[in-house]
Amino acid sequence: MLILLAPPSNRGTEIAARCKSYVFRKKNAVHFIFLEKVLYICSVIHFFLLMIERTEYMSLLEKWRDKKIIKVVTGIRRCGKSSLLRMFREKLLVEGVSEQQVQELNFEDLDNEPFLNYKALYSYVKKNLCPGKMNYLFFDEIQMVDGFQKAIDSLFLLDNVDLYVTGSNAYLLSGEIATLLTGRYVEIKLFPFSFNEYLQSMPSDANIEAAYREYIEKSSFPYVLQIKNDREMVREYLTGLYNTIVLKDVVSRRKITDVMMLESVVRFLADNIGNISVIKRISDTMTSLGRKIASHTVENYISALTNSYIFYSVPRYDAKGKQLLKTGQKYYLVDVGLRSVINGTKGGDLGHVLENVVYLELARRGGEIYVGKIGDAEIDFVVVQGERKAYYQVSLSVRDEDTMKRELEPLQAIPDNYPKYLLTLDNDPIVFHDGIKQQYVLDWLRNL
């Protein structure tokens, strides 16, 4: 009966098979399985089937499971950090970990307000540890606990503790805290849904180009999938999310008093994704529009915005001189759907939107990302992973001969033999131009 609860998918079949195996083991025991346990397992199946399977992130958590290292999941609010840990928690329970071995605390929940002090938190958790077994501790938005690093550090010293924490602000791993935890943590950077993950919510025969248009017009935030057919609800949700991030994670933490000026900077960055931006130029632009602002204030605002993960900054790299450049960066939004909420942009600028989508996918895949410069030409992305590099150009279309030439020239000028890619929305077969791989970007986004 349990197998019938799961639809004909690999994910459902796998979970149902685990549950069936569990039932068979219990039948061989002295006592019959309790009905409540069966119902619990059924609820776990239902929970898993409602979720988009975030395979890469789940694999990372499994890789570091039971290792003496703190798993720190970071990312913007509502990108799925809590859901990811909940999925992993349920996976542990299905695999035989007892509920007594798991402690889960969300510090945005008022019920957990008594533990917003490191001493109270440590005392409570230690008192409820299951002796003689591994204990799995899940702490959501841990940065809200005053002195949280002391509690984490003390719990880390216990042999039977496996720690998982989340945070929506880079403060979690900044300054003294990062120094204190050096060598004791691994950061798992979580983003809203990738295009490939988004496709899991759609029929297998969905039109891929229509799906991409929906992806960039609506949003990649997980909750939007539940309301995506109601445009007004999507806009209201994203507006509320944006306001929460700006007011709670930026204004409150940085004690910013001129909120209107901050929002002017936000709108400038959102309107200029994919363009080289210099702090002084932003300051001068604001001043020319009648909003006088000092360069150091712009710099502080941008720092606060990137720390809240709403924007990502990408420095420039001289591909020939092999060194970082001190001036000029590009900024990308964590979700292109937020752009219409921020500045009312409707359509247009699809080239920079595509570039933003590619940047986020590269960030998910790991490595240091830079904007490349070679002579007077620009390479959209240089990705460095250890000793390896890869170069990427992104273009809506290169079917025009002049456009093709313009996009290929910077890649052809690079004096090394690392992989080079030209990603476009032209739905053409893969072709190589003197070693440069041209690929349909929607296939690349799906790892095809």
What role is predicted for each listed range?
Residues 36, 168-170, 174-276, 309:
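Interdomain motor-coupling "hinge/lid" segment immediately C-terminal to the ATP-binding subdomain
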Residues 52-65:
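Pre-Walker A adenine-sensing motif
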Residues 73:
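Hydrophobic anchor at the beta1->P-loop junction of P-loop NTPases
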Residues 81:
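Conserved lysine of the Walker
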Residues 84:
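Hydrophobic positions on the alpha1 helix immediately C-terminal to the Walker A/P-loop
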Residues 104-132:
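Short glycine-rich substrate-engagement loop in P-loop NTPases that contacts/grips substrate
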Residues 162-168:
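Structural recognition of the conserved hydrophobic beta-strand(s) that form the central parallel beta-sheet
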Residues 231-389:
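Accessory nucleic acid-recognition modules appended to NTPase machines
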